[in-house]
Amino acid sequence: MYVLLTILISVLVCEAVIRVSLSSTREETCFGDSTNPEMIEGAWDSLREEEMPEELSCSISGIREVKTSSQELYRALKAIIAADGLNNITCHGKDPEDKISLIKGPPHKKRVGIVRCERRRDAKQIGRETMAGIAMTVLPALAVFALAPVVFAEDPHLRNRPGKGHNYIDGMTQEDATCKPVTYAGACSSFDVLLEKGKFPLFQSYAHHRTLLEAVHDTIIAKADPPSCDLQSAHGNPCMKEKLVMKTHCPNDYQSAHYLNNDGKMASVKCPPKYGLTEDCNFCRQMTGASLKKGSYPLQDLFCQSSEDDGSKLKTKMKGVCEVGVQAHKKCDGQLSTAHEVVPFAVFKNSKKVYLDKLDLKTEENLLPDSFVCFEHKGQYKGTMDSGQTKRELKSFDISQCPKIGGHGSKKCTGDAAFCSAYECTAQYANAYCSHANGSGIVQIQVSGVWKKPLCVGYERVVVKRELSAKPIQRVEPCTTCITKCEPHGLVVRSTGFKISSAVACASGVCVTGSQSPSTEITLKYPGISQSSGGDIGVHMAHDDQSVSSKIVAHCPPQDPCLVHGCIVCAHGLINYQCHTALSAFVVVFVFSSIAIICLAVLYRVLKCLKIAPRKVLNPLMWITAFIRWIYKKMVARVAHNINQVNREIGWMEGGQLVLGNPAPIPRHAPIPRYSTYLMLLLIVSYASACSELIQASSRITTCSTEGVNTKCRLSGTALIRAGSVGAEACLMLKGVKEDQTKFLKIKTVSSELSCREGQSYWTGSISPKCLSSRRCHLVGECHVNRCLSWRDNETSAEFSFVGESTTMRENKCFEQCGGWGCGCFNVNPSCLFVHTYLQSVRKEALRVFNCIDWVHKLTLEITDFDGSVSTIDLGASSSRFTNWGSVSLSLDAEGISGSNSFSFIESPSKGYAIVDEPFSEIPRQGFLGEIRCNSESSVLSAHESCLRAPNLISYKPMIDQLECTTNLIDPFVVFERGSLPQTRNDKTFAASKGNRGVQAFSKGSVQADLTLMFDNFEVDFVGAAVSCDAAFLNLTGCYSCNAGARVCLSITSTGTGSLSAHNKDGSLHIVLPSENGTKDQCQILHFTVPEVEEEFMYSCDGDERPLLVKGTLIAIDPFDDRREAGGESTVVNPKSGSWNFFDWFSGLMSWFGGPLKLYSSFACMLHYQLGSFSSLYILEEQASLKCGLLPLRRPHRSVRVKVIC
């Protein structure tokens, strides 16, 4: 007995009875009159996925209460059907709201119960009473119609329909009895589904207007031709074209669905018998174990009314919309965005379906017949159905039988005040009672600024194609019309109209920046040594207008370093002796001599005025001067003696006198080397670094073995090497067991960056509001008491629920407006203007805003492994990357920058970066960037509700029946275009990093970088014999004592793919270059500290070494630059510690002059000319003429006098 009792108590499917405890008489009952066990499974299928209370307390006839679980619903339902004569069972949840959820459904608007309850009240209490108590009673039996979803409606007269009240579709005859017309007691699935909570909120707000099926039967809306699209034979049928652009959802148990098509007519889709519509309403599925409803499912949320407003000349415009469904609004040639959207529409007389950009509704209450509901009671005395009844039920009454004021009618009617103001209300026993239908009246919508009365109005989810309302940010494109000129003073870039505020020029991994007041022309310094070496220079320019940055590649030819780096009065112009012209040499000598004379004269005058024993002070100066003159005379005499000795040996002088006449020519022989003492001074060793940094793999990490002619070496361990400067290479040399077995691991420093380490970030975009409004009179819909004043932003009015179910950002408002007849209301209390506002993205793109919490150095390295394969990696401080031979990590010693907290940055995923001149804000603030911020790009594009907003962003202006909503948001795209990088702030230039992967800063900094190479049992094979090659020296260009270095180029002819290695005699210098089959020119960066380079290398590709002489003249480039410039340059990696050195320079000067003797002679000439000590020198041969300008003058004397012109 207890087991049976437990099973019976587990019942959750019950018939709900609402009992209201008021002083007046009222009774509400739930009932059923038959059972149908075969329909239990179908009912359970529709209920088992619903949310129900976890625990229920149930009691049988109030005797005993037992807790049970809702999971027992299915078995308990079968037990109830099998049992007869059970007593009433009452169930409730943990809190009173659970009782309501069994009828209404849980907060997610789902239904749990499977019975329909109906309320009956006294006529005088209709429209005035409220619910006071709730109870649930399970009856012994369930009615067949009770297996439909629950409909809970506060208005008991929703089934009292206007017009004929027919809600059936042709061909579905099984429900004609209950749907033709809809009655208080009958079940009509085509109509009942419209009253399910949350499914059709617009119709439920205007439920006393006609449904689409009712409008068709009342000849308000016509049927389509053909009226129905049979899915069984719809393959290729054009009737499905419009249906397929709609996004719909159908329950599993409907066989047909209907909608308002593009022509403003009703169309439908249906399945053959025993088939039901699938979830998307596009296919038919055979159903077993469940009965199919013969009603038709509505695919749109709409209501209809009678109207005579003509819409044939009506033209509407939807901003930015190209197509809606199958309607083409305008031709769009640009980029389109396609999505399913909830779009309002309306149908007018003599018009097709009209889609609306927004829906503004207003209702005017009137005294037309459709505004009233009339009813009588079944079994009523002298009623139309006066037979005995077992239940209390109502029956609709035709209002046309009631007499109007001053008119006649066949029946006597009574009703509320509104009814009695238009109809004769009898004081006698009435046949029917009539009252004003809540929410009825003439509904008008605003179309093109005019209020018009539509036949039907509603919402549907349909495909919408929109053009991008604002042009997307253009990519950084090459400026094809810009002009570049390689001028001696810098690289000049001229635009074709836009003004340039800043620019970045890069070449060979070195970048320089420049900023100025906006102008159509900008002059940039040449990066590195590109001015003399030539080549391509990439320039990235920032504009001052609303367009983004642009770029251009300038090509400069190689030029003479002396021409491009020369000057008359400057530090590098002075020390670059090989570049002096006659003018610059004269200026230098004159300036230095004048400075010396002036200093001595001033010193003498000061000492003389102070009378501080000037003779005692001058005596040392005199002695020094005399000593210098003595040395000078001795050197001149020595030179004259040597010249005379040569003349005597060749026979030009006899007894100390020159021989007159023209002696016979004497055969010339190679000169005897008599200046060995002086030539010793030319043996000056110059330092160079070829592979910038080179180490040889030690035996501790190398193990080699020989297998025939092949050698295999295994590397396992760690090697530490300094990174090369930008453009240079660091090399690890691996030698096999043979002399010709050498391979290299080369790591080239491609570029260096001071990159931004990002902190917080958010996504933002261009967002605009869209507002929907509807004015309802007092006591209509949700406009009760002071509800409007207490309306919450997250509370959506019922008529906007269909739109409000989306996940976009939205808010709701209610504004009290005027009431009374002047405002179209019966009630003089204020009406309610309900507003639903949702935000939408204007552009189909989003921007990311971030700040930089730190600036870190990063190197881009190009690694060429032992087999010649090349890979490029990026490494930051203390970071590592794995390779096929092991791993490489980077250690940096550098300083960052500060002062970047006062601005933030914007990133466009495809267009680059921009700077914002305001600090990063952690919370959205009105009037600043990021008023609306989201956590992802997709959230911005969909204006998702998870986005954060600053308060009070939307301003409202209510105007009785309509409303304007506006925002004044900061447009991040305008900010992006205005601040597009590169830009200069705080004497630092910010630009996009290489590959557009971040933001970098230029600050003239330097880093000390070390690379740690970790080898993990990596094998290197030396297979067969090495290839042979020949190399010839081409040229040497660049600078000395500089970070850019010099570039040595060789012409290499090889029989195969391999590598050329070269070293000097003592093994301190190495050059490593790849060799390929054929002849190819290869270059490598070296660093020298002397201007005159002459170094002999031994090169080899196959172990057979041959000599190679590298010789050339280098110049100094700005060794001293104390000017302060805004912007800066790219970071220098491992700057050369050796600066310009006087002794190295002097040794180079002697080498350039041809030796110490020629250097002495040249300076002696200049000194002689300056001091006037000597007027001429005697030499005997023209080939002894000095470089400073010795011109031989022949005279008719025995001797040859040479006039000195210095």
UniProtKB/Swiss-Prot annotation:
One of the protein's GO biological processes: entry receptor-mediated virion attachment to host cell
Cytoplasmic side stretches: 17-130, 604-673, 1181-1206
Gene Ontology cellular-component annotations: host cell endoplasmic reticulum membrane; host cell Golgi membrane; host cell mitochondrial outer membrane; membrane; virion membrane
Region (Important for correct targeting of the glycoproteins to the Golgi complex but not for heterodimerization): 646-650
Segments of this protein annotated with the region Golgi retention signal: 608-650
Site note Cleavage, residues: A153, E154, A690, C691
Region feature (Fusion loop): 777-783, 819-830
Signal peptide location: 1-16
Spans annotated as Internal signal sequence for glycoprotein C: 675-690
SS bond partners: C179-C188, C229-C239, C250-C281, C271-C284, C304-C456, C322-C332, C374-C434, C402-C413, C420-C425, C479-C482, C486-C556, C506-C511, C691-C731, C704-C713, C756-C852, C771-C965, C777-C825, C783-C832, C788-C814, C818-C823, C934-C947, C1029-C1101, C1039-C1042, C1049-C1083
Intervals, Lumenal compartment: 154-582, 691-1159
Glycosylation site list: N794, N1035, N1077
Keyword Transmembrane: yes
A Pfam entry, by short name: Phlebovirus_G1
Membrane-traversing stretches: 583-603, 1160-1180
Keywords carried by this UniProt record: Disulfide bond, Fusion of virus membrane with host endosomal membrane, Fusion of virus membrane with host membrane, Glycoprotein, Host endoplasmic reticulum, Host Golgi apparatus, Host membrane, Host mitochondrion, Host mitochondrion outer membrane, Host-virus interaction, Membrane, Signal, Transmembrane, Transmembrane helix, Viral attachment to host cell, Viral attachment to host entry receptor, Viral penetration into host cytoplasm, Virion, Virus entry into host cell
Superkingdom to which the source organism belongs: Viruses
Keyword Membrane: yes
Region (Internal signal sequence for glycoprotein N): 131-153
Family designation: Belongs to the phlebovirus envelope glycoprotein family.
Name under which the protein is recorded: Envelopment polyprotein
